[in-house]
UniProtKB/Swiss-Prot annotation:
The chain crosses the membrane at residues 28-48, 71-91, 94-114, 141-161, 189-209, 222-242, 318-338, 356-376. This is Protein O-mannosyl-transferase TMEM260. GO terms for biological process: protein maturation. It is an enzyme of class 2 (transferase).
Length: 707
């Protein structure tokens, strides 16, 4: 047979193998999609989750612009899901959409591994271990951008494999164009994927150049396809120009405004947050490796390493793709660790950072799937046997089943109404026609969702404290807040006219022109503007506070009656993971029970008043503290300290018939409990010293009684 005949035969054989893998990969991918979609759909939260979900859903519902960089693709597709899905709350529909994104991502990971290795078991390992890790599962069933980002990670890797296997120049050109479009489209969601795009594009161009298929014309075409993928960003200036959305972020009607939003300048273009000092690069890298071992297991990490080691064998196919994927993982991990400026010692910030590790975990899962197939293949070659195929399937099955078993109870969110109840409690507690000055992601995003998407309390006006300091906020949003008077264009402690012509106003002036309405702050008040203090004070209103004119006299009995049962909150204390938004919401609602006694006690400590009135306030605070401390077995640890101090004040006052021995015993008991449960309190030494003194007093009192 001629050499040309051998070449044609090899090409035909390769084409047949690729064809079989392609059809098998599609069938397997569909099966993986169905299985993962079923699990994700079954465990979806029925209402709004925490984090950015409320804001993203509201932006989609209103067709506004989400926080930087805008996420236009997510916004438009979520709006489509809200319109087309005929069941569930608006939040549930977007949660379902994200669950389907996660299932597609799983099928693409399977497809990638199967096409690279020919191993269905390896593909199932990659898809299952990644999808059913706690981190991926948790963020695949919530209305967040991470699930769609996982989809694009899988899609870009699958297209890269497809390009490598393309047999003809025409097919390579077609895949390259589709890939260029998808690269552009992926940047319409989460920008962290640009690090993968910047690895894949040079690799594709190098392959085309090596095969002499890259010309100036083809490069121009690829650029046009990439640019076409960015078209969803047109939504930003259109939405901003129309200004129909009751909630939006930024003014993108100018090029400068568009670039400010697109480049995330309000957060810091290459940073996670504005004005934050984060953990060191080495700390974040070490935490990433530790987190990966927890999420995927050490065995998966080892298999990913094996995928690279097995490249040393001569008969391995597509080694450059394994190196490419490994390079993507390393570059992403190093860059993210460099720019993640959050302190991961704080559980909530750790929860923010770890979401971005999903992007690297997806690559590790693919490498592990390839590694499993490679280890089995090499072992079969050494043993000259095919008897390990069953072991390969058994390993993949065990890994996936273990992931589901380990994480199901944590990720089953079917009954999670925590953020929903938090927002509803805050809104329903408000008087008619009130103004709420929002502060922070938890109250801001959840209340906006309930107010704008679910139509709860349309009489209330929601104004964002932080946003009022931005020059775009009031020009865009004031018309959607008809019941609120703004004495200028921008909130600033220093009133005046800026060079741009904007009129600034302070909080005191804002409150004065809105005296006809009751105004509340949720949660907390902007520290940068203390002007309100000259004519207003903050009175506790559950998790929020009410701004009350100073001329109004505080009536403790009336206020206790108003705020004592302000919320209907039944969640157990401490039942949520500290890094979750559910934990933050639960903490806020529990601490709300303590705010009125704390306020009354503080009033007695600081205000100038007759001793009789002071004693009455101490007694009221003591009664309230005692009631909440003994009402629940588990409660916030600071309640012990506050109650102990209240007992000590009652003891010193001797204004009641209360037994001094009982008060001393209570003071000692709760100071001791507090010191045990909060050993890192800066006042720990003082508390221990006080305990020593109080025990002596108690002993002396008992001795006197005995005599």
């Amino acid at each position: 047979m001629s050499p040309h005949g051998d070449g044609r035969g090899q090409a035909q054989g390769r084409a047949v193998r690729v064809g079989l893998r392609r059809s098998g990969g599609i069938r397997g991918g569909v099966a993986v999609f169905a299985a993962v979609a079923a699990v994700f759909t079954f465990t979806l939260p029925p209402s709004v989750p925490g984090g950015d979900s409320g804001e993203l859903i509201t932006a989609a519902h209103e067709l506004g612009v989400a926080h930087p960089p805008g996420y236009p693709l997510f916004t438009l597709v979520a709006k489509l899901a809200i319109t087309l899905f005929p069941f569930g709350s608006i939040a549930y529909r977007v949660n379902l959409l994200c669950g389907l994104f996660g299932a597609v991502a799983a099928s693409l990971l399977f497809f990638t591994v199967f096409r690279l290795s020919g191993s269905s078991a390896g593909g199932i390992l990659a898809a299952g271990v990644f999808s059913f890790s706690r981190l991926t599962w948790q963020w695949s069933i919530a209305a967040e951008v991470f699930s769609l980002n996982n989809l694009f990670v899988g899609l870009l890797m699958a297209l890269t494999v497809h390009f490598e296997e393309a047999a003809t120049a025409k097919e390579r050109s077609k895949v390259a164009k589709i890939g260029a479009f998808c690269c552009g489209l992926s940047l319409c969601n989460q920008h962290t994927i640009i690090l993968y795009v910047l690895c894949i594009i040079p690799w594709i161009l190098f392959q085309l150049l090596k095969k002499k298929e890259l010309s100036l014309g083809s490069l121009l075409k690829l650029s046009l396809y990439f640019s076409a993928g960015l078209l969803p960003y047109v939504h930003l200036p259109i939405s901003s120009y129309l200004n129909h959305a009751r909630w939006t972020w930024g003014d993108q009607t100018t090029l400068q405004g568009f670039l400010t939003h697109f480049l995330r300048e309000e957060y810091g273009t290459f940073s996670l947050a504005k004005s934050e000092i984060g953990s060191s690069m080495s700390e974040i890298l070490l935490s990433q490796v530790t987190n990966m071992r927890t999420e995927l297991s050490f065995n998966i990490q080892a298999l990913a390493v094996c995928a690279n080691i097995c490249l040393a064998t001569k008969d391995r196919q597509n080694p450059s793709l394994v190196w490419l994927f490994t390079g993507m993982f390393c570059i992403y991990s190093l860059f993210f660790a460099w720019r993640a400026n959050l302190d991961i010692s704080k559980p909530l910030f750790m929860g923010v950072v770890e979401r971005f590790w999903m992007q690297s975990n997806a690559v590790v899962a693919v490498l592990a799937g390839i590694g499993l197939a490679a280890v089995v293949s090499e072992t079969n070659r050494v043993l000259n046997s095919n008897g390990l195929q069953c072991l390969e399937w058994l390993s993949a099955t065990l890994f996936v089943v273990y992931q589901i078993y380990s994480n199901y109870s944590v990720c089953d969110q079917r009954t999670n109404y925590v953020i929903d109840k938090f927002a509803k409690n805050l809104l329903t507690s408000m008087p008619h026609d009130a103004i709420i000055l929002l502060r922070g992601d938890l109250p801001g995003n959840s209340l906006r969702y309930m107010h704008y998407c679910e139509g709860l309390r349309p009489d209330i006006s929601l104004v964002d404290q932080e946003m009022m300091t931005y020059e775009w906020y009031l020009p865009k949003m004031a018309k959607h807040l008809p019941g609120v008077n703004f004495p200028g264009n921008r909130w600033n402690p220093v009133e005046g006219i800026l060079p741009s012509g904007m009129v600034t106003f302070n909080l005191y002036h804002f409150l004065e022109v809105n005296k006809q309405k009751e105004t509340f702050v949720c949660i907390g008040i902007h520290e940068g503007d203390p002007t309100w203090k000259k004519n207003y004070s903050l009175w506790p209103w559950g998790s929020c506070d009410k701004l009350v004119p100073l001329e109004i006299v505080f009536n403790p009995e009336e206020w206790i009656k108003l705020t004592k049962s302000i919320y209907n909150w039944t969640e157990e204390y401490g039942r949520f993971d500290p890094s979750s938004w559910e934990s933050v919401a639960n903490e806020e609602m529990w601490q709300a029970r303590m705010k009125t006694p704390f306020f009354i006690f503080n009033l007695a400590e600081t205000a100038h008043m007759p001793s009789k009135v002071k004693a009455q306030l101490y007694a009221q605070a003591y009664d309230l503290y005692k009631e909440i401390v003994y009402l629940q077995k588990e409660h916030p640890v600071n309640w012990h300290k506050n109650y102990a101090i209240a007992c000590e004040r009652m003891l010193r006052l001797q204004a009641r018939d209360a037994d001094p021995e009982v008060l001393l015993s209570e003071t000692i008991r709760h100071f001791r409990l507090y010191s045990q449960k909060a050993p890192n309190d800066p006042q720990q030494a003082d508390i221990l010293g006080a305990l020593k003194h109080l025990r002596k007093e108690l002993q002396s009192l008992r001795n006197r009684k005995n005599v």
